[in-house]
Amino acid sequence: MTYQLRDYQKSASDAAVSVFKSKEKKNYVIVLPTGAGKSLVIANIAARIDGPLIVFQPSKEILEQNFAKLQSYGIFDCGVYSASAGRKDINRITFAMIGSVMKHMSFFKHFKHVLIDECHLVNPEKGMYKEFFEDEQRKVIGLTATPYRLCSGRGGAMLKFITRTRPKVFTDVIYHCQVSELLAKGFLASLKYYDITKLDLSRVRTNSTGADYDEKSLLQEFERVDIYKDIVGWTKRLLNPKSGIPRKGILIFTRFIREAEKLASEIPNCAIVSGSTPKEERARILKGFKDGRIKVVANVGVLTTGFDYPELDTIVLARPTKSLSLYYQMVGRVIRPCQGKEGWVVDLSGNFRRFGRVEDLRIETA
């Protein structure tokens, strides 16, 4: 399969290749919106770099998905090194999980070029990545759509750009493009937002970390407004509208398993995906969802990253959050482009009121 880069993809690839070929020793970041084709950028960088390149992925599912895309672009001098994926092949280009690599560090001494997908997940204070970076000869570039980390301070939790935290792993952004730019060029799907929440989040306490809402307090607010009734009711309306065409597929983000179970008990052809769903069952459900055999998927704490389904046209947000990154990742599931698609964001959680349209979010690097 041959491919042609869009202008912003070429600019991102050029920036990475320039850094890898330079004598710079800093760790850099490339920021590309969800749906911008990050996997293609990674593939192009890999094809242009001389010598070994290791590409770290945050999960088995994303690793397998992006590795398959790499090979679909005609790049075959590549391998997978991941215990969870059941493969330990080292090649010039190696897609890997950090845990598997750190158990056999000596195998990877010759890898001096490093890409890290979803790099906002890297802990700058401790962990396996920090140990891996201690080799000063390595050049590291991270890629993300959400370059933020939640940091604690005297005033409570604060969202900071990952190049401005203390300590920090990444020092500078070498390339970024805005969501609004890609929308204007037709590279992302247009979105329509429906703000219909009944929740009063001022009644909900923040958890002990300051990062998000307290679960017990949030559950009490859910029960006060009977959010379960609203989730079921709006899902039925989306499946059987009084006018217009029913939505192609509906992905619902819930906070607790009980909302998902309520949906599954009242909505025919609704499946549940959670962290405890067996891998084979999860794969079967998502295949059925993409094939159109399953119309509704209620997911609990998963499918916020790496779920690639461009035809998806509707998400229902029933998971309140204080995390801008999480909000963006959830909306990002429906912003991927598909011909003739208008993505719908049906918000029962108050997230839209807190953060607004993702199209209006801007990355300011200065």
Show which residues each predicted segment covers.
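Conserved pre-motif I regulatory segment
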Residues: M1-V31
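Walker A/P-loop
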Residues: S22-I45, G249, F253, V273, ...
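Conserved Walker A/P-loop ATP-binding site and its immediately adjacent core
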Residues: T34, L40-S72, R255-R258
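Inter-Walker segment of RecA-like/P-loop motor cores
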Residues: Q71-S106
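Conserved interdomain linker/interface between the two RecA-like ATPase lobes of SF2 helicase motors
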Residues: T171-L251
